[in-house]
Amino acid sequence: MLPQLFLDRMKQMLEEEYPAFLNSYEDTRYQALRINPSKTDTDRFIEETSFHLQPVPWEANGFYYEKEDQPGKHPYHEAGVYYIQEPSAMAPAAYLDAQPGEKVLDLCAAPGGKSTQIAAAMQGKGLLVSNEIHPARAKILSENMERMGVKNVMVTNESPQTLAGMFTEYFDRIMVDAPCSGEGMFRKNEQACEEWSPENVQVCAARQQEILACAASMLRPGGRMVYSTCTFAPEENEGTISRFLEQHPQFHIVPVKKYPGMADGVAAWTKHPAAEIGDTIRLFPHHLHGEGHFVAVLEKEGTVSENYRGYCANGEEKPLAKGEAKAYLAGLQEFLGKIPADDAGRLFLFGEQLYLMPEHMPATRRLHVLRPGLHLGTVKKNRLEPAHALALAISPQEACHSWNLSVDEARAYLAGQTFPAEGEKGWYLITVDGYSLGWGKLAGSVMKNHYPKGLRKLL
């Protein structure tokens, strides 16, 4: 049941469009997935898949699928071949337009849809800091970054205020997918509907101002920031952006291409609208195939030199010294083929866990870090056991040994089953149709299952 006060406000906002908006709640909800370009070629996947896919206009790797496809129950999902994501939610990261080699912050990143989309655009180059303030959600974020094979991410569990105290004009781009009243998700999420109130809208709007102010201080001059919500409330959209611009005159709204069905922000819906508020973007379910969303693309005025680094209070993390790294490199070669020289210079020990640091990764002290780069393995006595994250980040060609499974065999592997195998003993990268899934270890004539017990499931 939609809240009556919400309906009354939407009727006032939409006027003659209101009946069409209301009818959209009776329509089937559109579902989509985003293909992971680090795992597969998009054209190849479309050609080979049995899924019924249609393109999402604003995201090159995004596709609507049909309910009977059930991509979440396919082993390809566990292999990180795609990420299931609400179609409208793909728009903000597309407009962020992150580039390889940049330093990018996703400030409110859980569960990870936008972060994994940003990571795909960065192609494993540069530094992505994906942050989430709530510990349980930060854990889910970290797991999703792992599943999608992201190599250059630092996952943190901090408040925006703590990060703002660490980083000054440091990031090239910042995504602020702000906590909101969730009105755009009422069709998808009954809990958001039950928790809604006009008072909560005001609370969210105030919190959004605080988050944006923190983000503003961390963005370098000339940098881009995208603000997004999944709500219709003007107080959290046009209102929040107008107030932010009034308090931060060094920012302006960037006019961007709007795709068919996207609407302009509306000045009349807020008391003191910014002059260019019409250049923000509204996504309504009665206009396009997706849920409710709002997007504002902002730019900070000024320019910086090519070698500009910004300020990080922690400084950069120091990698292992060459002599110390040498022993771990030997351990890695038990299950990896050739290790690039550049990677060999970025090894980092986090407790007993060996990681490959992203370029220019900030030092981890005074930060609650869940994932400082790509997890390579666990140090156990005098040996190195490969990490699940490593399996998901490499191709079969990069492993010393690999073992390919059919889809049905992969389902058994994901459930924790062992299987008979013959070959050279040792670690094997287990794949499904050539997509990496996890590790197995061949001993005797049995491939022991090393898929993490906490992730095992029946598909």
Regions found by a protein language model. Give the residues of each.
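Conserved SAM-binding loop of SAM-dependent methyltransferases across substrates and taxa
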Residues: 111-124
